[in-house]
């Protein structure tokens, strides 16, 4: 029984049954007698009353004797038949209600009273549960002792709904064993194991009896019907030197069957006498393998939940259009070639594969394997390119990957993906593969129980023959799963990238996921956020973000796929020798990327797996992809959380690959922050800073991982942001409304590729938001940063993001300053969580596997995973590549007054004004200490702050995050602060294009010898930072006569891309600042009207005419000298006598003014003035209910609303979510709690009044009986 409260109750005695039956018959006769006569004599009434009292006491005794054990209280479904507390008033009154409802001789006046009381009690229970849920109190009542019973016996005390028949006590029959529990045929105990919350089960209690998984057979073609988390009859066994027949001997001695080799010295065993689906491990067989000296390690395999990443369309898409198409550019006679818009659309709106084909690049000689549910090898469009050496059936353990056919064709996924890659061209049938000259194979591994051994064996299939592995599946995209590859699959990734393709590394391409509707984040998928895989996202026909797409920082690039209603989909092969035009989801994107990778490998066979990733980053096209989260990283590359670095360009990748030189050896540097144990209260956030100065082996970043150990009352309330030293803002984790797990994260690696090419040296900031409610505290235990990259640059012209800090480096006692390359040991990428989450050893196998260290080569990796022969590092400060001096918001070190170099490390800033501070010393320092600073911003500062408080600081100190600006001491010629002026670049947010641009506030200081009498008095005390136009510097800098004027090295004009976030996020999501660049030239510094532009990046430059008109208006108002209006905006390069003329102009001109406020007023009409006027097409996209999730998806504004209704499933899921965060999302905290308390108090009042009235009725009834007697 699914999602219901399950109870066990013992059988009542025969006397009770007879009493119940007699009560039913007597009650019926009494009812008939009342309907016939209007009078009752005193003797008859007294007899009925005495009998009623006797039977009421008998029923109450029976109810008290029944012992009921609650299996689970499902609060999510609001089932209120569970005893929260056995001695609570709810249970007592419920038993009283049950006893009274079983009475035979109730009067007409007492029946409606009992019904009213039952309604009030039910409302009272509802109020109590809502109150407990709102204050985030979780509980589990009863003990897990047995399994579910039938639906009819789930509520034994439920009153009858029919008013004609009196209620009776329902006694449930004993549940049959088949419906209660799946009993192991080996005679193992049917008692369920305790709840197991670990990453192996996706962070969910898969073994609970109310999840509907037990007892279901499940068809072989439907992966979702399999029992998730159960123990299978297979083992993974490590037998050193097992190839000489020892593995077969071990299997035979212990009754196993050797299914084959997984990879080096690891074998796949099966025992046919063990149940294929068991709730408990087969400890007897596990012990026998552990006691065998020939076996180094063995572990029984458990099933994993893996889903295919496509979806079913409600109706087919529209047909293809030949407008602006390059269909005729290639003479293909395949019937579906005109409809393959993503290959032949032209105009820069396709994958640009036709130019590569014209160069003779078709993927010939490259082998691609599809890891999926099988491959129809005899398909007319696949059989010519089918490669049997690249195929295997892991589910049935044979060489034929043919899929299992069923009524719904559920195993068509692999055949569709294979057709995208290598469908035969010019065969007058179906489609054309993007690499139609490549060889393709298939691995059938999703059509059965998917275990760690099954995944590892699929990923390790013939790595010297197969070049590319394409996978369009992964953990459930339900918005609440956190899962990744197990220990064997992780080892398979490492083996493939280090030894595959003759040492150049196998290429693993993965679909990013289809959990966008559930607001899932692909950084919770351990396959897509792995450094070994190339994660691919999707774009619609119009270049929008699909409604199913997930956003995360690990996505590297994008290919086309399906979109909304009316947009075209992907054409490919299908089961039964057919063709389809409706392949969908990110499942269709990954095979297209695999086909492009095959073209690139044909052009250069010497490319490594890292070379391909570098080529993708350098050639991806951000153009024509619409997403508000586009930003520039520290080296000027555009990157997005939805599209990665952009759309893959096949022809450009082939061109670059032909002349590509192999990248240097990849280095690895890990920095372990000290143990923090930092509590994060609800609705707050903390900022942690980690300064990196010792990772000398990594100067150019590729991948960055943030390993975090964190616990939370609700994992979905956690948000993570990372900011690099080059001010690249990365969103590591977004809120997940369906994730109610309390297991948190245990050393989970959140990966980012957004800092590709930057330098790791400098201050890194990790910002953790807790959007929980009330008592939903979070606790950060530890975190670390892992940098992957190279020591030397890849190209001679690659930009440098952040220069290395100068000065000597000091080391603290609790750290070490060593770096490690890839040949040294490091912690496993995806550690396993023990069942109890307290560090106990995992089940199965007391021995650790023994691995061989691969010989040194490019990209060589050795891990301390149990599968390798290296001891795990000790807990603490192993492999620390930086030193730590823990400070609290203050600079560590003294500044040098002679310094001309400043380091400006800006902290993360939230919407409510919280600012993180980071300090540091500038100039040449004798001693330099790396800082690990924890900054908790719990107070809010007003945006209007006193200027007078900013003027008491010393000269030449760093500007700390734009909050406090230290200005030099006043000279003797300065009278007071009122005679000083400040250059202020304010903070402004403008809507331009698809995103919002926010200029960071900057304060530039200068002094003047005369007072500005026209400045309002208000701005002598306050500055309205966010209301000042950033491009106009209202004050001119005038130097004293006779002193040389130095060019001022002001701060850059920094641009933030503002991305609004859904829910109660108190932080601006995905803010992106421009990189740090060399200071502007003297001409740019002295020209006060021109904005300071960042090198190599675009900036918001106001229109010249607008600025000139503004100057004319200011001159007409008398606030600007007329001579200053003559300054032309085009005058960028100053003449030699420019400074002299400027100083002379300043002496003649009057005092300057400051713009205090500016507004824009629009006058117009809502509709066109004339019926023939063309409507503005952009107005339909101005309002968006989805925030930025669907801001550029035109299906959002479909006139029919049909596809809009399907996309609203995500919002419906929000309303159906019974968690406290989703339930109270529409109301504020106080309103939600207040309404619950008010409802609870009202119910209590009704209950007390009703109880008082009932007591009075009982007293009156007793008085009547006494009078009759």
Swiss-Prot record:
Low complexity: bias regions: 13-28, 150-163, 811-821, 835-851, 905-915, 929-940
Tissues with expression: In adults, isoform 1-X is expressed in CNS, fat body and female reproductive tissues, and in embryos, in CNS, tracheal pits, hindgut, posterior spiracles and anal pads.
Biased composition (Polar residues): 38-57, 858-868, 1005-1014, 1062-1074
Domain called Peptidase S8: residue spans: 340-654
GO MF annotations, alphabetized: serine-type endopeptidase activity
Reaction(s) catalysed by this chain's protein: Release of mature proteins from their proproteins by cleavage of -Arg-Xaa-Yaa-Arg-|-Zaa- bonds, where Xaa can be any amino acid and Yaa is Arg or Lys. Releases albumin, complement component C3 and von Willebrand factor from their respective precursors
Residue positions with a glycan: 15, 18, 28, 108, 333, 426, 606, 727, 814, 857, 897, 908, 994
Topology in membrane: Multi-pass membrane protein
Pfam families: P_proprotein (PF01483), Peptidase_S8 (PF00082), S8_pro-domain (PF16470)
Record-linked Gene3D superfamilies: Galactose-binding domain-like, Peptidase S8, pro-domain, Peptidase S8/S53 domain
Active-site residues, as the UniProt record annotates them: 372, 413, 587
Biased composition regions of type Basic and acidic residues, renumbered to the chain: 975-985
Enzyme Commission identifier(s): 3.4.21.75
Composition-biased stretches (Pro residues): 164-178
Database matches in InterPro entries: Galactose-bd-like_sf, Kexin/furin, P_dom, Peptidase_S8/S53_dom, Peptidase_S8/S53_dom_sf, Peptidase_S8_Asp-AS, Peptidase_S8_His-AS, Peptidase_S8_Ser-AS
Enzyme class per UniProt: hydrolase
The P/Homo B domain, residue ranges: 662-793
Source superkingdom: Eukaryota
Family of the protein in this entry: Belongs to the peptidase S8 family. Furin subfamily.
Summary of the function given for this chain in its UniProt record: Furin is likely to represent the ubiquitous endoprotease activity within constitutive secretory pathways and capable of cleavage at the RX(K/R)R consensus motif.
Entry protein name: Furin-like protease 1, isoforms 1/1-X/2
Species name: Drosophila melanogaster (Fruit fly)
Gene behind the chain: Fur1
